[in-house]
Amino acid sequence: MTATSTPPSTSSPYAELKAPTTARRLLTAPTTGPLAALLLACAFFSLSTDQFLTGGNFSLIIQQVMVVGTLAIGQTLIILTAGIDLSCGAVMAFGSIVIARMAAEGTLPPLAAIALGLVVCGGFGLLNGVLVQKIPLPPFIVTLGMLNVAFALTHIYSEEQTVTNLPGPLTALGETFPLGYTDVTYGSLVTIALFLLLAYALSSTGWGRHVYALGNSPEAARLNGIRTSRLTIGVYTVAGVLYGIAALLLISRTGVGDPQAGQTDNLDSITAVVLGGTSLFGGRGSVLGTFIGVLIVGVFRNGLQLMGVASIYQTLITGVLVILAVTVDQISRKKAR
């Protein structure tokens, strides 16, 4: 009797273990949860109202979130360093009044007024960063105080009046152009470009890696040669400039300089960042996640409005979403340990 030999298997004994790796990565990716929440929200509102799933409504959502989205990019940078900025909406409002009034009264040409607004908002960010890093003071206290400072300056400088009769360059980004089945504003393209730029900076540059390192452990980052003081101040300053860009987008969308603008944008920007999977404890998150979070906020507000839900209940639901998102983040952090 001759023994027959079985040819050796060419497949790796770990093939079955490796096969689901890609699927597992997708399921455990930080943006998977927010993306699933966005799709579920879209499905719910599509079934709840016939007006939701239309090209015109999607265009409206994009227009509504471009301002908060730009604020949320700056907020993401700060939260990644384990900070927070409660002043973003007020700083944006003050920047919008500076730009609008300087241009409307002819004090400065429109482009110079825009540049001044960016410098002013960047200055607020710089001051926040210096107070947080050099004194040092808790980011919550610093930005809460700066919120009141910017709010007061907005009403003082505007004299409680809405600035109208703005020159064309200030509202140009609010103009629309056809794209597929809907219309898109030029300002929306600016916001998307900013998301892409900051996503690249955080994921593919040394500066971005330093931001994550600072959020994970300031002491470890310092021991590894990262200039944490300069980095923190730089992050707050960049965020301030982004608030200035948001001010211009706000003007282009509304066509006026409104001293009452931005009062709910602080909460909305933080909500978008948290819903997008960025940890309030720093060191974990992404601009892509924030982009999804911004869309979640926009879809919820738009869908609830179409359903006739009162604004106070929309605020209530937004608050609940924030608490749930932070709770999930805290639970996942404990499991990771």
Where are these regions (language model features)?
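Alpha-helical transmembrane segments within multi-pass membrane transporters and channels
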Residues: 107-147, 292-293
